[in-house]
UniProtKB/Swiss-Prot annotation:
Compartment(s) where it occurs, according to its Swiss-Prot or TrEMBL record: Cytoplasm
GO terms assigned for molecular function: translation release factor activity, codon specific
Protein name as it appears in the record: Peptide chain release factor 2
Entry-annotated residues carrying N5-methylglutamine: Q254
InterPro entries tied to this protein: PCRF, Pep_chain_release_fac_I, Pep_chain_release_fac_I_sf, PrfB
Species this chain originates from: Neisseria meningitidis serogroup B (strain ATCC BAA-335 / MC58)
Amino acid sequence: MEAEVINQLNNTLNDLEKRSEDIRVYMDYQGKKDRLEEVIGLSEDPELWNDPKRAQEIGKERKILEGIVLTLDNIASGIEDNRMLIEMTVEENDEEGFAAVQEDVAGLEKQMADLEFKRMFNQPADPNNCFIDITAGAGGTEAEDWAGMLFRMYSRYAERKGFRIEILEEDDGEIAGINRATIRVEGEYAYGLLRTETGVHRLVRYSPFDSNNKRHTSFASVFVYPEIDDSIEIEINPADLRIDTYRASGAGGQHINKTDSAVRITHEPTGIVVQCQNDRSQHANKAAAMEMLKSKLYELEMRKRNEEKQALEEGKSDVGWGSQIRSYVLDSSRIKDLRTGYEVGNTKAVLDGDLDGFIEASLKQGV
């Protein structure tokens, strides 16, 4: 074993120790550890299960806290253990044992990188599940097909992350793709990961629907908003709501239900409209639509609160509903984020859900 390799491994452990100390302060390790002990006590109370929703919230909080506290504990013990193992393997000239130490340290580095990534989740709703609205722009079949491609891209991204997805509302295009859709994404930090995807996505390609094989430009809008749990209070006056029911429809506008089970809710003071046709039960669709409305009202309030702050921050773009954020030029094999400058050439991988590079770049730059 070369001295340079041994020194490099020891330096890596020293660096990990320093980063661990920094992140303990930033993430309030002691505060989270104390809260975890409280949450564990609450979760072990048999009375908790009399309130399933509260039990679910406690379970979710416990999982998030354990993800931080136990990871930092594991990194700390791993640093000390591997320092001793380095000494032992060097003394015994145990190359196989030293290789195992190198592998374990690489694992510690990965855990630390994951924690440092979570530092970028600085909004209260970042750990929450989220909803994604996808709407085709003007342009008929071209735009509807593009909206369908985005629908698949986000579905595949969610699958890659181990998230659960639920289609709440889907209006198929006349020939291909979708006119609009709403999906619910369930998973740890789903909103934090996907929130910077809000905006207009532009596609440039040679159209498969054009017999002359001309180049076409299409647009679709994406809007991501968090699912709000009972820890965040959103007051809704029933008098402000207009509730309409209609028959759920499938491809080409054909009715797939004989009863008016689909629900559309309009919040008249803001003009926000939500709709759900996922369930055959009108009651279930209304409950789901109300959750979506609460989430959209929360997102609207957060945007209002941040408006003045964002206006003062130089270099930060307004990622509003009408802002073009990303360009997908398929014939040139180029996808570029217009806010961060991040660009890739593997268009197939991105459209198959490989969005990590774009999301990491946008979070790092505070988009």
